From Swiss-Prot:
Protein family membership: Belongs to the universal ribosomal protein uS3 family.
Name of the gene: rpsC
GO cellular component terms listed in the entry, alphabetical order: cytosolic small ribosomal subunit
Keywords of the record: Ribonucleoprotein, Ribosomal protein, RNA-binding, rRNA-binding
Domain of life: Bacteria
Subunit structure as annotated in this protein's UniProt entry: Part of the 30S ribosomal subunit. Forms a tight complex with proteins S10 and S14.
Annotated spans, Disordered: 216-277
One GO MF term: rRNA binding
Organism: Bifidobacterium animalis subsp. lactis (strain AD011)
CDD domains tied to this protein: KH-II_30S_S3
Function statement: Binds the lower part of the 30S subunit head. Binds mRNA in the 70S ribosome, positioning it for translation.
Stated name of the protein: Small ribosomal subunit protein uS3
GO biological process: translation
Domain KH type-2: 43-111
Basic and acidic residues: bias regions: 264-277
Amino acid sequence: MGQKINPFGYRLGITESHRSKWFSDSNKVGERYRDFVLEDDAIRKVMNKDLERAGVSRIIIERTRDRVRVDIHTARPGIVIGRRGAEAERVRAKLEKLTGKQVQLNIFEVKNPAIDAQLVAQGIAEQLTNRVTFRRAMRKAQQDAMRAGAKGIRIKLSGRLGGAEMSRSEFYREGRVPLQTLRALIDYGFFEAKTTYGRIGVKVWIYKGDMTEREFEEQQAQQGNNRPGRRGGDRRPRRGQRAGQRPTGQNQVKTGPDQQMEAEVSKEAAVEPETKE
């Protein structure tokens, strides 16, 4: 099962989160679930086409009632922003025309592109387009990923490799890539190289390590804390958690989309219960 299915969808809700974050149960035209799905697909196609040279890793879309938030994770943020933000403004205006809503565009830089599967696949495809031998391109990508800290990498090329008349597939692997293990952090990327002989498909799997039980519990707790409680506020404390008792968990303060800072709950914040005479 793990060998065939998409690694991202296989681990969705376990080690991976959704890349389209919204909910719709409306029957109104333009606000239905299928309308939003088609709109998300159109947004991603436009972004990948206009920012093909920017090295876009992933696009995350969030929706509210009258606003669409688009987060772009790229290895070359300067190309996306442009001179004095002209390119970013052009992309935002194009998305507003497509969606008919106000668009908030956020650009994030990928710190280590050598272990980002989508960027590695794009890099191999660019080399194949420039007529670099496929074995050299695969070997260089493997060496760069392992040197950058990956625990394993697997690359598959399919098509008319080297201009051969009959298409074939070739695998290259280094290290461990446990596709069946759910707690394994597997990054997956796919890209097509357009060569003079036709298209060559590039698939990349990168193994970055296992998610520990503590990290999994922290992720689940964070997802639970992000859900709004009653009247838009936080949920009431449990019956056993009275005033004066220190909670067992930790408050997580978000400092960015890819970073988290944990703050311990101080004992001085506890309030002693009042006694009636």
